[in-house]
Amino acid sequence: MAESRGRLYLWMCLAAALASFLMGFMVGWFIKPLKETTTSVRYHQSIRWKLVSEMKAENIKSFLRSFTKLPHLAGTEQNFLLAKKIQTQWKKFGLDSAKLVHYDVLLSYPNETNANYISIVDEHETEIFKTSYLEPPPDGYENVTNIVPPYNAFSAQGMPEGDLVYVNYARTEDFFKLEREMGINCTGKIVIARYGKIFRGNKVKNAMLAGAIGIILYSDPADYFAPEVQPYPKGWNLPGTAAQRGNVLNLNGAGDPLTPGYPAKEYTFRLDVEEGVGIPRIPVHPIGYNDAEILLRYLGGIAPPDKSWKGALNVSYSIGPGFTGSDSFRKVRMHVYNINKITRIYNVVGTIRGSVEPDRYVILGGHRDSWVFGAIDPTSGVAVLQEIARSFGKLMSKGWRPRRTIIFASWDAEEFGLLGSTEWAEENVKILQERSIAYINSDSSIEGNYTLRVDCTPLLYQLVYKLTKEIPSPDDGFESKSLYESWLEKDPSPENKNLPRINKLGSGSDFEAYFQRLGIASGRARYTKNKKTDKYSSYPVYHTIYETFELVEKFYDPTFKKQLSVAQLRGALVYELVDSKIIPFNIQDYAEALKNYAASIYNLSKKHDQQLTDHGVSFDSLFSAVKNFSEAASDFHKRLIQVDLNNPIAVRMMNDQLMLLERAFIDPLGLPGKLFYRHIIFAPSSHNKYAGESFPGIYDAIFDIENKANSRLAWKEVKKHISIAAFTIQAAAGTLKEVL
């Protein structure tokens, strides 16, 4: 009997203990803490402070000096050795892995036995003038070998000969002016255009559409020579002997021209070279403004239509076609012998594995290859990426590990069409679209030294504002102020003077495949020029032999503090995205941006008010979808601030909705004629790859619509793209609703 009572007592104790446990569990489940504790917030902030404090300007300077001693053109031995050097350093920094990943892509190089040049020939076919083959090397670099001469990668081979026509910047509107207002036909002509305003590949495409048989590109002092500044090496201006290199593809996001949509591996089917995507069918060649002045001096024909067609050379900028007076029998001949060949390239991919969510990735990537020394483009970004990786490694050595996985990437062959980054995205597409939270670009960290410039998805606006308020400004006169304060004062948003300007993402760098094709939230930050006063395009010595370490050290960032600020911002962005319990995206900013973009495209359409009425075109569905998205974003935000941060399932569900929102704006069918540009809200402009356009499908349908051959079909296309945009936004709103 005593034994039975003992067993009963034991079972009663166990039952009571179980009941107590269940009661505690239920209380803990239903009475949810809504906020992170003050201690956890302070710890999170302290780690970020340690990260940014670890970064040193002197280290960035040292990396930049080391990486710019030799040229590192994609596909060359020097660039492979630089990849190995970066890989070795990443391992030394303490990254969990650092691997070389190769692809075999189509690249383009000058012919080593036949030099490219432009000539003027007389009636006897005698060449009476030739442009320069090479740029004179800067002091201290006279003995450096393997410097590629100025050329335009992927130009067609050929020796076309004909009359010359000056076409200003070779923009769409420039050719419209020539053809529609001035009656000048470029068919069968060689055209000469100045660099600037738009991507060089768009210039070549426009020239081909106009019927030109070749195009010469040059950097006019009006666009690449700042007033009261000496040419390099005495100043940072462009010497007259320098010529801008660059590819002239029109890939529209395809990656390797021979394997569009698929990674360029050994097993991959390849198109024939003559079938390659976006490869020009006409010769293209760049020259310096000293040589351009000679070609332009002899032009006859019509005077320039207005001052916007005049540069700063001592010539009349007559349009042509052909030369004037006694020189009218002379022609221009191009000599272009570039060779396209399949070449192996190498990315370096490093990782720090996450401790809680290793299957969620934040990518920090930038390209390594350059046309010559590349001290600004890209190596100011390479040096910054290296210092960020070192600083994260330092945190690791002290016991810290991120919540999510960080992927560091040193891309190859960006200058040849964003090839390294695109091929890696294609190879890993199934993983990336399921697991990637964000892509932060680490291309050039400076393109000027006036103020910060940020281009990013609206999801990142608030995070950028927050972090720049906590980073000291490197600008003179702002010693006791934040980066945010100097940025706001120098470059306020045109829509809201109380906020600094943030630009839309276009293309022109390695974020393209991740944002435009895969819908991964992306952003980039660097220092830039004063756009109000500095009217020159880009920085003057862009893509020339004169882009040296000394250029940066003497003129652009002597203290390296501006590059340090960029490193701190890029690094802090990665840290917050990888280690915040809730992904720090703000969906309400996206809703506000959609309102502004919808109003903007509608106002553009109102220039054709009568046609809108005649063809029954309405934007009501678009505005309705934007309204629904705004309401869904507001409801989501209310739920987000109430989520139980101690419930990992609830946190994961909300984070998945945040992560996948950008993906919701992707149309798998792509934009018309641009299969790999799939983002319905943002895309590179069809007329300038560098610029971002909102509602690109609608914008392109409306562009020049008054000159379309079939007005009914043209407006029908507008209706179609309004419908696609409305559906996409409505569907995106659906992804924000509470999970059933």
From Swiss-Prot:
Catalytic reactions of this protein: Release of an unsubstituted, C-terminal glutamyl residue, typically from Ac-Asp-Glu or folylpoly-gamma-glutamates
Assigned keywords, A-Z: Calcium, Carboxypeptidase, Cell membrane, Dipeptidase, Glycoprotein, Hydrolase, Membrane, Metal-binding, Metalloprotease, Multifunctional enzyme, Protease, Signal-anchor, Transmembrane, Transmembrane helix, Zinc
GO CC annotations on file: membrane; plasma membrane
MF terms (GO), sorted A to Z: carboxypeptidase activity; dipeptidase activity; dipeptidyl-peptidase activity; metal ion binding; metallocarboxypeptidase activity; N-formylglutamate deformylase activity; serine-type peptidase activity
BP-aspect Gene Ontology terms: carboxylic acid catabolic process; proteolysis
Positions with a binding annotation for Zn(2+) 2: D377, E415, H543
Binding positions (Zn(2+) 1): H367, D377, D443
Glycoprotein is among the record's keywords: yes
Record-annotated membrane-spanning stretches: 8-31
Domain description: The NAALADase activity is found in the central region, the dipeptidyl peptidase IV type activity in the C-terminal.
Name of the featured protein: N-acetylated-alpha-linked acidic dipeptidase 2
Organism in which the protein naturally occurs: Homo sapiens
Organism taxonomic ancestry: Eukaryota, Metazoa, Chordata, Craniata, Vertebrata
